[in-house]
Amino acid sequence: MQVLVASRNKKKLAELQRVLAAANVEGIELLSLADVPEYPETPETGATFEANARIKALDGVRNAGLPTVADDSGLAVDALNGMPGVLSARWCGAHGEDAENNRLLLAQLSDVPDDRRGARFVSSCVLAVPAEIADAADLEPEVAVTGEWEGRILRAEQGTNGFGYDPLFEPAEAPGQSSAELTPERKDELSHRGKALQQLVPALRVLAQSAQ
């Protein structure tokens, strides 16, 4: 069963592959947006992570005709009243500029003491399935899940793994380390996206079994 991951980020594709392998789910071939004919993507105008993930997942079903997993993730900082939130990827105004986003966040928190630098990563994932495939598998056409990862914002970047705000995020479970210093397997276990993807495993297992 081919399943589209609505992203061109190879690390996100690899993350879901590791989650499926750890759960012994076989029979799923993951494709990225680079593997299917290009299609016009609907702007992510949702006010929540789940709304944006749903937009991307339904785009995949409508244009590629495949079951599609999409996520929208971001950072919620207590001292910034939950921002950057859904604006995380374009916090500095340019989508995908990780270094600029990180510099801006550090500047905004420069006067915030360590005990008030609490933050969490949030990931909402949506699995959308074409109606005929959902009916055959006795599966809901949409499955939405959310994972959160608590921690705090460091005062300087640490580590070279991961992407986005990972070098600035100190997980509650790993004091003194950033999430960019964790192994991929440890990050899958702890992270917001890993937690969300693990909740999708039962539905993906049903899809795989329905194709056998």
Curated annotation (Swiss-Prot):
Its EC number is 3.6.1.66. InterPro entries: dITP/XTP_pyrophosphatase, ITPase-like_fam, RdgB/HAM1. The keyword Hydrolase applies. SUPFAM superfamilies: ITPase-like. CDD domains: HAM1. It comes from the Bacteria. Keywords: Hydrolase, Magnesium, Metal-binding, Nucleotide metabolism, Nucleotide-binding. One of its GO terms (biological process) is nucleotide metabolic process. PANTHER family: INOSINE TRIPHOSPHATE PYROPHOSPHATASE, INOSINE TRIPHOSPHATE PYROPHOSPHATASE/HAM1 PROTEIN. Binds 1 Mg(2+) ion per subunit. Its cofactor is Mg(2+). GO terms for cellular component: cytosol. Belongs to the HAM1 NTPase family. The lineage of its organism: Bacteria, Bacillati, Actinomycetota, Actinomycetes, Mycobacteriales. Substrate binds at residues 7-12, 73, 163-166, 187, 192-193. Residues 183-192 have a biased composition (Basic and acidic residues). Gene3D superfamilies: 3.90.950.10. GO terms for molecular function: dITP diphosphatase activity; ITP diphosphatase activity; metal ion binding; nucleotide binding; ribonucleoside triphosphate phosphatase activity; XTP diphosphatase activity. It comes from Corynebacterium urealyticum (strain ATCC 43042 / DSM 7109). It catalyses: XTP + H2O = XMP + diphosphate + H(+); dITP + H2O = dIMP + diphosphate + H(+); ITP + H2O = IMP + diphosphate + H(+). It is an enzyme of class 3 (hydrolase). This is dITP/XTP pyrophosphatase. Residues 164-194 are annotated as: Disordered. Pyrophosphatase that catalyzes the hydrolysis of nucleoside triphosphates to their monophosphate derivatives, with a high preference for the non-canonical purine nucleotides XTP (xanthosine triphosphate), dITP (deoxyinosine triphosphate) and ITP. Seems to function as a house-cleaning enzyme that removes non-canonical purine nucleotides from the nucleotide pool, thus preventing their incorporation into DNA/RNA and avoiding chromosomal lesions.
